[in-house]
Amino acid sequence: MTNIRKSHPLIKIINGSFIDLPTPSNISAWWNFGSLLGICLILQILTGLFLAMHYTSDTATAFSSVTHICRDVNYGWMIRYMHANGASMFFICLFMHVGRGMYYGSYTFLETWNIGIILLFAVMATAFMGYVLPWGQMSFWGATVITNLLSAIPYIGTSLVEWIWGGFSVDKATLTRFFAFHFILPFIIAALAAVHLLFLHETGSNNPSGITSDLDKIPFHPYYTIKDILGLLFLIQVLMLLVLFSPDMLGDPDNYIPANPLNTPPHIKPEWYFLFAYAILRSIPNKLGGVLALVLSILILAIIPLLHTSKQRGMMFRPLSQCLFWLLVADLLTLTWIGGQPVEYPFIIIGQLASVIYFSIILILMPISGIIENHLLKW
């Protein structure tokens, strides 16, 4: 009799994806982030579900309903802060995952990479809409500023913004629809993640050396299930340290003030994980130009496979490209810092320089370094 996990129509899919999956024997801890992202998504859906049981998406009661969750619901404060800080952990894992893909040349799996970019946009949209729901000052003004960017689109811009708002300003209709979208999007993300995995398993995983590993594959279970559990323990430890000791460290104090359309906060800024893109947006004095730069800062990932000039897949044996990669990481950290600073000298010029460096590294310097390294191979 054949094993049920290999014959049952449903269980054999799980078996092929998580148990008997042939995996390269040399993948490092940088390959942990895919499973961690899956766990983050499940955690966010579960905590979000419990929050939705007590939340009301009405401008009059949204803020007080969140307060009610924190004060009156059993462990409501913990569920709320796990959800808020879980989003931060989600983005840390996302950035690491994308960075790993760039470093080791995983973008040569085109379908997997492109679905990954769609996933990134979907997660960013979900996080943005989630930030609006508590209806604090930063929620309201963040929603106003970011949705207003669409008015830069020629001809249809203003109509589009009012259509999204459901009126002439961010109001009850906006909050209700944002809640609806924030609830449905994680399930769409889960479906996209399954497709992401489907395409990945068509080709098999990449590995640090960048060369084919078909000759040296090992089963996913028990080797990588154990390795992933170690990563999971680290993730939960960091998350619970944040939740239990400094739950508001990554948040904005202004969001504890109820939304007031008549009073603008001194510095409107998004959550920390959007600051790099926000800095790029602010560094261009033109509204439409800024919006284009903002979108391109993420969409640029889609053309990375076209800019690959090296004969080698990853950067493991390419010191010049490694230097550029870590320069890019430093540049993104600089942009993140600048995004949280007020719009004044010297922050404006630093932001503009960092934005130029960001696009220059990806579009110009990395392809050139690939060509130089190809020539060095001939020596």
Swiss-Prot record:
One GO biological process term: mitochondrial electron transport, ubiquinol to cytochrome c
Cofactor binding: number and manner: Binds 2 heme b groups non-covalently.
Binding site for a ubiquinone: 201
Membrane topology: Multi-pass membrane protein
InterPro entries assigned: Cyt_b/b6_C (IPR005798), Cyt_b/b6_C_sf (IPR036150), Cyt_b/b6_N (IPR005797), Cytb/b6-like_sf (IPR027387), Cytochrome_b (IPR030689), Cytochrome_b_C_euk/bac (IPR048260), Cytochrome_b_N_euk/bac (IPR048259), Di-haem_cyt_TM (IPR016174)
Single annotated GO MF: ubiquinol-cytochrome-c reductase activity
Binding site for heme b b566: 97, 196
Main localization (coarse): mitochondrion
Superkingdom in the source lineage: Eukaryota
Gene Ontology cellular-component annotations: mitochondrial inner membrane; respiratory chain complex III
Homology family: Belongs to the cytochrome b family.
Quaternary structure and interacting proteins, as annotated: The cytochrome bc1 complex contains 11 subunits: 3 respiratory subunits (MT-CYB, CYC1 and UQCRFS1), 2 core proteins (UQCRC1 and UQCRC2) and 6 low-molecular weight proteins (UQCRH/QCR6, UQCRB/QCR7, UQCRQ/QCR8, UQCR10/QCR9, UQCR11/QCR10 and a cleavage product of UQCRFS1). This cytochrome bc1 complex then forms a dimer.
Record function comment: Component of the ubiquinol-cytochrome c reductase complex (complex III or cytochrome b-c1 complex) that is part of the mitochondrial respiratory chain. The b-c1 complex mediates electron transfer from ubiquinol to cytochrome c. Contributes to the generation of a proton gradient across the mitochondrial membrane that is then used for ATP synthesis.
The protein's name in its UniProt record: Cytochrome b
Organism listed in the record: Prionodon pardicolor (Spotted linsang)
